[in-house]
């Protein structure tokens, strides 16, 4: 008996004499379309796994400050096999000291003679991922670079050996200090690639014995594929061609290379049922339409202040460490439909494709007799991703019969997992185990509604993991203080502060044996090679974006003589990539003895100014009080200015920062806010 091509409407066993009868039966109302699941004619491409990204930037910033057991629970939902998302791949930002969407992530080398492999939280996250799944693949990708790499230019490629040394040092540090083996490394996220640099990077990796580290290029569009086709040395250097938000289609040049193709960043959509529908559709159709064998979500967990760009666009949400509340969102369970029933190294079958009345199906095997089929019927309006635009199409309810052939023809029963994401449902169904389906005469039939996901599999290992409900959501505390007195901090950043320009770190002030031994310090002294339009000022935000009436107090220590400057702020209305456009109330003092009150971060909207008598290298206390339309400021407990009309945003975060990239210390930070409700 011949095989039935995917989407064929001819049933097995229809000989020439019975063709008219068979055709009539197939075209009868409600007759199921028929699809083959067959490995007899060979297999498709090898499956590389489903993954997610931390970074690009600071998307996991608040996660590290969660209390236990909630922090462990969140990590289990993300990484634990056969429990939640069960991710196969984990991609992190190689911090470059610059704003990369929702904040800055610190570099392991702020300066040429500086190496510190404990900054930030990506090392910790990679270890937590490996702890739960030792087989998870790890990827590092720079979004930005410390300024010294560019030798004064906003460009990382003029000295490719220097950039390669910097990136490879991160890989070596991961192994030396954390016993982490990095599997893949990228070039420069969504920015220009440089062919010479890619070759130098490959040579450097090989020379240092890192031949197993693959290069992914170029984390933008498919443009590098043309260069790979015409340059045999580049072709040899690149292991994976990765594109972002490909709309489920790969360029012909990319397919022609014969290389592994990935959607190396995708999704980036609000994590409700529509976001889940987006994720379900592209997880299947990135392979069906584009031969992409891995899809990686930006971002993994929305663990940053919601009012920053792309709020709630993670697979799940964990944005309230002060309350312990988190939300296991729909995309977690859509991920599980694939990840819990496949592994990297499985193979797609050639018999994959689109369903007759809309939707798609893929089938994968471990070549040891196991089979997993994932089916999605996402409608257009229930699966719109943030980008690119989605052309209109129709999906309707349908019956589908799947014929198991080749090595699967003797299967008798398959496990079934089901989700219904229809936005009109008051209670969507996610990842529900149904009664196993019996295979009769080598086939099984499903009644497929619209906006449904089915996983049909030989594997018995699926689980919808759960924990007791987390604590209820509550806003940031109205009173909060931090004296930064942590002798051995587990992380380099103080809780809840979200750096938006510059890098703020715990600091031990050995020159001050008194009250300011342990402080919080802005440590960048040079503008980084940026990914966004970074501010020239450093700023870290904290608190509740809805705060309006507030008092912010902080001890400050300017280290730069004559030109140094520092601020405390309230009602800061912008973070992320547009931080340089932030408005609010900013109270500045400078090492030249002056002060200034501005309505913006860049200092163009001057509300008042005068003499303060502040000098560098001594501690002072700044207090900013904002109430209604008026603001006032105190220096060392005495009024310096008062009743300045604000005229700017009505609410926003509290913040601290510096007038340039310069060393400055902060201590005894305190907030007292009135309930915005």
UniProtKB/Swiss-Prot annotation:
Major subcellular site: other
PANTHER family, per database record: GALACTOCEREBROSIDASE
Entry similarity comment: Belongs to the glycosyl hydrolase 59 family.
Catalytic activity: a beta-D-galactosyl-(1<->1')-N-acylsphing-4-enine + H2O = an N-acylsphing-4-enine + D-galactose; beta-D-galactosyl-(1<->1)-sphing-4-enine + H2O = sphing-4-enine + D-galactose; a D-galactosylceramide + H2O = an N-acyl-sphingoid base + D-galactose
Coiled coil: none
Residues annotated for substrate binding in this entry: 101, 143, 189, 387
Species this protein is from: Xenopus laevis
Gene3D superfamilies: Aldolase class I, Exo-inulinase, domain 1, Glycosidases
Localization of this protein: Lysosome
InterPro entries per UniProt: Aldolase_TIM, GH59_C, GH59_cat, Glyco_hydro_59, Glyco_hydro_59_dom, Glycoside_hydrolase_SF
Catalytic residues as annotated in Swiss-Prot or TrEMBL: 190, 265
Gene Ontology terms for molecular function: galactosylceramidase activity
Gene Ontology CC terms, in alphabetical order: lysosome; membrane
Extent of the signal sequence: 1-33
EC annotation from Swiss-Prot or TrEMBL: 3.2.1.46
Pfam name, any one: Glyco_hydro_59_C
UniProt KW keywords: Disulfide bond, Glycoprotein, Glycosidase, Hydrolase, Lipid degradation, Lipid metabolism, Lysosome, Signal, Sphingolipid metabolism
GO biological process: galactosylceramide catabolic process
Name used for this protein in its record: Galactocerebrosidase
